[in-house]
Structures are given as C-alpha cells and as structure tokens.
Curated annotation (Swiss-Prot):
The lineage of its organism: Archaea, Methanobacteriati, Methanobacteriota, Stenosarchaea group, Halobacteria. Keywords: ATP synthesis, Cell membrane, Hydrogen ion transport, Ion transport, Membrane, Transport. It is found in: Cell membrane. This is A-type ATP synthase subunit D. One of its GO terms (molecular function) is proton-transporting ATPase activity, rotational mechanism. Residues 200-209 have a biased composition (Basic and acidic residues). Belongs to the V-ATPase D subunit family. Has multiple subunits with at least A(3), B(3), C, D, E, F, H, I and proteolipid K(x). GO terms for cellular component: plasma membrane; proton-transporting V-type ATPase complex. GO terms for biological process: proton motive force-driven plasma membrane ATP synthesis. It comes from Halobacterium salinarum (strain ATCC 700922 / JCM 11081 / NRC-1) (Halobacterium halobium). The keyword Signal does not apply. NCBIfam families: PRK00373.1-1 (NF001542), V_ATPase_subD (TIGR00309). Residues 200-224 are annotated as: Disordered.
Amino acid sequence: MAQDIKPTRKNLMEIEDRIDLSERGHDTLEQKRDGLIMEFMDILDQSQDVRSGLEGDYETAQQKINMARAMEGDVAVSGAAAALEEYPEITVESMNIMGVVVPQIESTKVKKSFDKRGYGILGTSARIDEAADAYEELLESIVLAAEVETAMKKMLTEIETTKRRVNALEFKLLPELHEGKEYIDQKLEEKEREEMFRMKKVKDKKEAQEEAADEAAAAESTGA
C-alpha cells in the first residue's frame, strides 16, 4: 500500500524509475501481444485450409480403400498393406515466431513408387494402387495438420500469457506505483509547507526580537 512507503526524495526517485520501466515494459508487451495475434490469425487461416484439405483427403482415402476392398477383397488389401518394407520417417525441428518456439515437422518416404511398396506391380490392381496413393496423401496432410495445430496452440498459450502480463502491469502494478508516487508527492509537499511555516515563524520571532532590542536600545538612549 502507498502508506507503507517512506515519503523521501530517494523513494520518490526510485518509484519514478519503476514507473518509467514498467510503462516501457507495458508498451513492449502490448506490441508483442498485437504481433502474436497477427501471427496467430495467419496460422488460423492456414489451419482452416489444412483442416479442409485433411477432411477431403480422408474422405478420398476412405472411398479408395472401400472400393479396393469391394473389388479385390479384404485379404488382398491386407496383404498389400503388410508387404510394405520401407516406413515413412518423421523429423521434428523448431522455428521461432516472436519468441515462441513452434515445431517444423518434415515427413520423408511417404509417397512411394509402385516398386517401393513391397507388393510388386503384378498381382495387384489399380484399385489398390489408388488406395495407396490416397493414404500416402492423407498421411502428408496429417503431418501438416499436426504442425499447424501445435503451432496454433503454442501461439495461443503465449498470447494469453502476454495478455495476463499486460493486464497485471496496466491494472495492478502501474496504478499502485502511481498511487505511491502521489502519496510521496503529497507528503513531501506537506513537509515543505510545514518547513516554510516553521522558517517563517523563526524569521518572525527573530525580527520581533530584533525590533524589541532596537526599542530597548532606543529607550535606554532616551533615558540617558
């Protein structure tokens, strides 16, 4: 509370420095918050496109696999899937967006040529190949969606954290500091007025004493 602060010139200078530092910090955090929101909106737009693409790829993959099962049978489809020898590889790196570390997910060996799928060209139909193509496309969409969704969550968390810090400065710390400054200013002004009043009394008393001394000296001179 303001009343807990000792009203001295030193404390006034310290609290003014804290106000200046806090206001500059508040401005910096506001700029960061606004920048994060803009970046988040860009990622949100991208996320909507990615989700739409993912849903479309999922529906296509389901249609292709259902068609392959209907035409070739579950045994043939399962056998083609089990023949896969080289699995996709996922690598995760990071990227910094305004101080927020977000993942960059790269997938390799997802899309394969016919001879890399393990089941061979002969003995399978175009339906199975189309289903494989569709699921490879779906897997790449899933990887991209995971990257974008994770980035969006991290950005949103940082935005909320920054907003809380801005609000703490704006609605708690800065008002308390300004209240403390006003309290010290008021007390110092009171002390200054009291000191001026005291000095005036001393001056008046001194002048009265000098005047009395002058009158006494004059009376003594007249009596002589």
